[in-house]
Amino acid sequence: MTLRLFDTETRALRDFVPLAPGHASVYLCGATVQGDPHIGHVRSGVAFDVLRRWLLAHDYDVAFVRNVTDIEDKILNKAAEAGRPWWEWAATFERSFTWAYQQLGVLPPSVEPRATGHITQMVEMMQRLIDNGHAYAAGGDVYFDVRSYPRYGSLSGHKLDDVHQGESAGECKRDPRDFTLWKAEKPGEPSWPTPWGRGRPGWHLECSAMAEFYLGAAFDIHCGGLDLVFPHHENEIAQAKCAGDDFAQYWLHNGWVTMGGEKMSKSLGNVLSVPNVLKKVRPQELRYYLGSAHYRSMLEYSDTALDEGAAAFRRIESFVLRTQERAGEVPVGLWTEAFARALDDDLAVPAALAEVHGKVREGNIALDGGDLEGARGIASQVRAMLGILGVDPLDEHWTQETADASAATDALDVLVRAELERRQSARAEKNWAVADEVRDRLIRAGIEVTDTPNGPEWSLKAGQ
């Protein structure tokens, strides 16, 4: 079966036919690094990591670009409020996003360009737009003339009369529907030289210029969150087409993570940061949960839903680990036809997971019935399918994390045992003050101590 993808622009499932046979070029709108990532931010990374893995599994040479927006109004405002340099603020949270992606096992992109590193490409694209009659300079700003592009609105379905760019009208705009390509220099803000004066780039220009620079005038797939369809992606198309590029052939958009039916966002105050959620579940469990819904569907968050997702992953993991323990090494095998049909149908992960869980049930029956070779064969299939979804429990990414955690636990055990011996000695000497002080310090560190007939035992409190 041919891979079919839902293209936002045509509003239809389309067979994936790459521009160059055997090669796939993908651009994913990455983070605006204004603060710590929440699980809504990283859902797109997880969703389109599955697309990338599925293409790689079919021997495509995949060029995968994920940008970093490191200059933008929110970054400048938050850095100023905190009294920190804008570049330091951006770099700090870029590292936070990189850490989050790594924790969730998202493959690193082929390249991760920063907007500030591509001013030359942006200036060159603006010049082409002006030369082609699609942009104009006014008052130090540069604007895109929306009326000059007859197909404006083709991606989002917006009618020109209804367009609102979400930015100030601007005294120098010819039409309030025009959008900003370049912002004139303001006191205290970073700026770069251009033929039209110093300033900094508008949000939309960055991605068009970087996509063209790395993937060429035409490339296969452009991905991003549903909230980017308008105005960001609509404006990307307008810029690129009017600059002479064919641009993206397919447009894919993932749904939001919602809470109470509303999009998870910092402004609504319903943010769950990745570090905080990872206090509740392991990284592979969070990845399983974020990837368990169809990428185009909304994912309604609740603690119960997260726990159910984690439990579902542990059932799969338990089967694979039990099989390895009883039947020996479990190599990565081949996925099933049903799994392939599901992913070829617009990356239908829920149907793919239904196949995985069906195989796990079949494998557990074989394992419990003593058919070790049968269970081993099924576990090999399960590993192949989980690998595409990025949650194979025997993958080095997750086993290394487990090994690191085990080493950390061993080191902690040595330290805690030393404290417990000190507590035992104090109790034997009836020095209750010292014994209580040791106990209280361990409690503050998140360590619970239980006195047993065989001596004290310790454990980490839930969520530590």
Swiss-Prot record:
It holds the Pfam family DALR_2. A motif ('KMSKS' region) lies at residues 263-267. One of its GO terms (cellular component) is cytosol. A motif ('HIGH' region) lies at residues 31-41. Binds 1 zinc ion per subunit. One of its GO terms (biological process) is cysteinyl-tRNA aminoacylation. ATP binds at residue 266. It is found in: Cytoplasm. Gene3D superfamilies: Cysteine-tRNA ligase, C-terminal anti-codon recognition domain (1.20.120.1910), HUPs (3.40.50.620). Its cofactor is Zn(2+). Keywords: Aminoacyl-tRNA synthetase, ATP-binding, Cytoplasm, Ligase, Metal-binding, Nucleotide-binding, Protein biosynthesis, Zinc. Its EC number is 6.1.1.16. HAMAP family: Cys_tRNA_synth (MF_00041). Monomer. Belongs to the class-I aminoacyl-tRNA synthetase family. This is Cysteine--tRNA ligase. It comes from Rhodococcus jostii (strain RHA1). The lineage of its organism: Bacteria, Bacillati, Actinomycetota, Actinomycetes, Mycobacteriales. The gene is cysS.
